[in-house]
Amino acid sequence: MSSQVEHPAGGYKKLFETVEELSSPLTAHVTGRIPLWLTGSLLRCGPGLFEVGSEPFYHLFDGQALLHKFDFKEGHVTYHRRFIRTDAYVRAMTEKRIVITEFGTCAFPDPCKNIFSRFFSYFRGVEVTDNALVNIYPVGEDYYACTETNFITKVNPETLETIKQVDLCNYVSVNGATAHPHIENDGTVYNIGNCFGKNFSIAYNIVKIPPLQADKEDPISKSEIVVQFPCSDRFKPSYVHSFGLTPNYIVFVETPVKINLFKFLSSWSLWGANYMDCFESNETMGVWLHIADKKRKKYINNKYRTSPFNLFHHINTYEDHEFLIVDLCCWKGFEFVYNYLYLANLRENWEEVKKNARKAPQPEVRRYVLPLNIDKADTGKNLVTLPNTTATAILCSDETIWLEPEVLFSGPRQAFEFPQINYQKYGGKPYTYAYGLGLNHFVPDRLCKLNVKTKETWVWQEPDSYPSEPIFVSHPDALEEDDGVVLSVVVSPGAGQKPAYLLILNAKDLSEVARAEVEINIPVTFHGLFKKS
């Protein structure tokens, strides 16, 4: 991958500045030629409000949700954005203060209330945020913006108007759900969230939302739990951001980053903690990998174990003969990476940003190979017999299977993150190419393509340019896996540049096809999708 680039001007700080929403779409200035087959909308979520009055938000995942849209039609591009009218946002705007506790920011009681009313207000229970700043996904004919709690927010993908809040707890037994559901080609949605299982111990439920049926009823009302994974700790679930899915299997990676529920329920209610205060690391458990039979809806009790890492994003998971291939964006060690994503750290001058990143867990793209058929007679042997990987799986005398990965990409403080693939055709299947956002000491400064078979890489990078997660859009007449384009929102605060633009790259070699520039800044976005017309 590319050599390390320096950012002494600190232009990345523009990613974390408050912006205003738009009353109507802006016409973007296009250079290059946008493919005429590219028609539809790029929808993205991220924070757009980093303070309320004089009260700042402290963490990257705290700012109020802003929904962005780039529309493509006949070679022209428009840009629009609206704040999502969540309860967190509406109440903050009404009361001119932070009302609901966010990921790393505490909401304090109304200063107008006396001490007694403030005290009793703490006992109304934990007020969970609905700040849907992480992702957007389809359910039936509808679209929902989400964070990682039990609340998702229905939005209009054309006007960007907020329609309604939905509480998943009204339909299934989960305390929350990830912002990375899997969407099958027929519209079936799978997700995972922790729950209270037998004897009040914690477990993880897989939620299935069916596709839209002939009766046109809301598919969410037909949600069901299809399988349950056990938890390594009865009262401390692991933080889960994504999971793996193939036609026949579900893969859940349980990391040592734990949520202390006692702290969540007591400290939060009584002393005003936030989500970040409730995380802790189990320094001895390592990582447990779990699998379930998707079609039979049955947990498979194979005890896969490996050394500790943080995990946020699965790249892809697929079946290869009697093995599961699990490709992950890992961060080495048990310390929580989110400890390094406070806005004060991310807004530091470049030398301080680098100093902070050197203390953090280091990134690595890894492939784990999970054998499905375990024969006790093979104790002490490597069960991986595939010829095309160096990953191993050793059956131990205690019946655990110790996994060592094949490293697909590693660079000191150079992460390949926010991965995307040709998901519609290759999700859950053997594949060759992954696209990622390159993080340089946590600063997004390049786009990458990785051949997971040969480990060859391609890079797009320009000075003072800070891209977002790459979104792959397949050519309608594609013959090969990487026939298409890659879309990314780039913030470009350098002298002589427009503040931001939508970048279109050839997915084959990451060469520029076109860009659509706008005259306003666009803050950081996390995840999104391309909605075809």
Curated annotation (Swiss-Prot):
The record's section on Pfam families has: RPE65
**Reactions catalysed, as given in the entry:** an all-trans-retinyl ester + H2O = 11-cis-retinol + a fatty acid + H(+); lutein = (3R,3'S)-zeaxanthin; all-trans-retinyl hexadecanoate + H2O = 11-cis-retinol + hexadecanoate + H(+)
Where does the record place the modification Phosphothreonine? Answer: T101, T105
Tissues/organs with expression: Retinal pigment epithelium specific.
Q: Which UniProt keywords apply?
A: Acetylation, Cell membrane, Cytoplasm, Endoplasmic reticulum, Hydrolase, Iron, Isomerase, Lipid metabolism, Lipoprotein, Membrane, Metal-binding, Microsome, Palmitate, Phosphoprotein, Sensory transduction, Vision
Membrane topology for this entry?
Lipid-anchor
**PTM N-acetylserine: at which residues?**
S2
- Write down how the cofactor binds this protein: Binds 1 Fe(2+) ion per subunit.
Question: What is its subcellular localisation?
Answer: Cytoplasm; Cell membrane; Microsome membrane
Q: Which residues carry this modification: N6-acetyllysine?
A: K113
A single Gene Ontology MF term assigned here is: retinol isomerase activity
Phosphoserine sites (modified residues) = S117
Q: Which domain of life is it from?
A: Eukaryota
User: What's this protein's function?
Assistant: Critical isomerohydrolase in the retinoid cycle involved in regeneration of 11-cis-retinal, the chromophore of rod and cone opsins. Catalyzes the cleavage and isomerization of all-trans-retinyl fatty acid esters to 11-cis-retinol which is further oxidized by 11-cis retinol dehydrogenase to 11-cis-retinal for use as visual chromophore. Essential for the production of 11-cis retinal for both rod and cone photoreceptors. Also capable of catalyzing the isomerization of lutein to meso-zeaxanthin an eye-specific carotenoid.
- Return the similarity comment: Belongs to the carotenoid oxygenase family.
Name the UniProt record assigns to this protein? Retinoid isomerohydrolase
